[in-house]
Amino acid sequence: MKKVIVEKQDLRHPKWSHGRNSSGTAGTFLKSQGSVNGEKIYYKLSYFDSEKGIIGHECANEIIVDRLSGILGVEHLEYQLIHADIEIDDKVYDTWICASKDFKTRGDTKTTLDNFYQVNRLGNESHYEFCNENGWRKYIDTMLAVDYLILNRDRHGANIEVLRNSKKRSIRIAPLFDHGLSFLCSCYTEEELDKFDILMDRPCQNFIGSRSTYDKLKLIENKSDIFAGKLRVQDEEILFRDLDGV
């Protein structure tokens, strides 16, 4: 699958609805869905302001994290970045949108980890302890490390999903997804970009651990065995390929 489609597509037909915005900002994140060759496709926009239009860069962040996860050998939902004309409230916007396939397989139903925890916890175990008891420690440790690397601001309990399949009698965690609110997502001007300290620890909404992505690393016992792959200097070209002008 080609990660970035630069040639502009006509995607004015999808109807956009409000997605969950837990970042504390006044704007919104719009989502939609469609079908390509009979396969369901999910679309989402970057940060949208009703007066200023689409001013965020969350969709570009998704592609960068997608590529980073692939290099590191992390199971994740794959995204495609598409240059497109879209229509919101009878107004056409020239923008970039993210597209992804459904990570559920036939017979799967999904619930948030937050809900799964509330229904199935046995006592006062922490979110991290609960995941460990269910055999998901490696997954969670990997997620914590990824969130630290990208400064993910929004790993709430609905951004981690549990998949059930009654026919297969299986319960598993969904691949990592939804990484738009990361990197420099809070910067909308050149001045804000210049002032942003990439080494500063910032408060984030986390379902597991504290509000600090750095402090959460203390939960990981074997930090040297987190990733199957290794990030190299030359991988910069892969991470940012075809993103000039986005």
Regions found by a protein language model. Name each.
Residues 1-111:
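Conserved ATP-binding subdomain of kinase catalytic cores across diverse folds
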Residues 16-51, 113-135, 224-240:
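Short secondary-structure boundary segments
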Residues 59, 98, 131, 185-187, ...:
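Generic recognition of cysteine residues
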Residues 62-64, 117-122, 193-197:
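Short, low-complexity, polar/charged sequence segments that are solvent-exposed and flexible
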Residues 67, 71, 147, 201-202:
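Short, residue-level hotspots on alpha-helical faces of the histone-fold
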Residues 90-144, 206-211, 219-222, 234:
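ATP-dependent phospho-/nucleotidyl transfer catalytic cores
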Residues 124-183, 188:
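Conserved kinase catalytic-core segment
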Residues 165-246:
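C-terminal catalytic region of ATP-dependent kinase domains
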